[in-house]
UniProtKB/Swiss-Prot annotation:
It is found in: Cytoplasm. The gene is coaE. This is Dephospho-CoA kinase. Residues 3-198 form the DPCK domain. GO terms for molecular function: ATP binding; dephospho-CoA kinase activity. Pfam families: CoaE. GO terms for cellular component: cytoplasm. CDD domains: DPCK.
Amino acid sequence: MKIVGITGGIGSGKTTVCRYLKELGVNIIDADEIGHRVLQNKGIRTRITDVFGNEVMNPDGSINRKILGELVFGYPERLEHLNKITHPLIEQAIASLLEEYRQKGIKAVAIEAPLLVEAGWLKLVNEVWLITAPKESIFKRLRNRMGLSREQVMARIQSQATDNERLKYASIVINNNCRFEDLKSCVQLLAKERLELA
């Protein structure tokens, strides 16, 4: 089974690349989505409130990701503490899905993980595709998609590895500074060549 890690900074276009891969029959594992599910785990919620206080809780007992994000982004020590709580369970869930796909004879899997390098998940993949985009495009996407201010976007960008750091591990670099049609064609070609998909 071919396993590719799709990584890059926030707003770089990882999800778009994964959407195109899914259209080609690649199974997608979204690490952020798994992370959101991990936050629903009662034991994890308790550990998070022990560290960050009850202010991160919604009235229904779930974690308020917006408030939690404000508390950790821009504060490396806090973010590291949160990651130590959540990353082991996320990795465990990814590994479990990969094993399930292996058992089913799945040919190709892509793991969408912005923190693939930082979380130490490189061991889960055969190769890394790095998605990059100009900063101004990222600011625009995140303002439109998430309603984040420039300062909030910068805090998130600075909490992640730089593209230069990720580049050390990348087999493929996709510069998402093009039209959707061109990006889709690029992904189709890479899927054919690297994942042996027709």
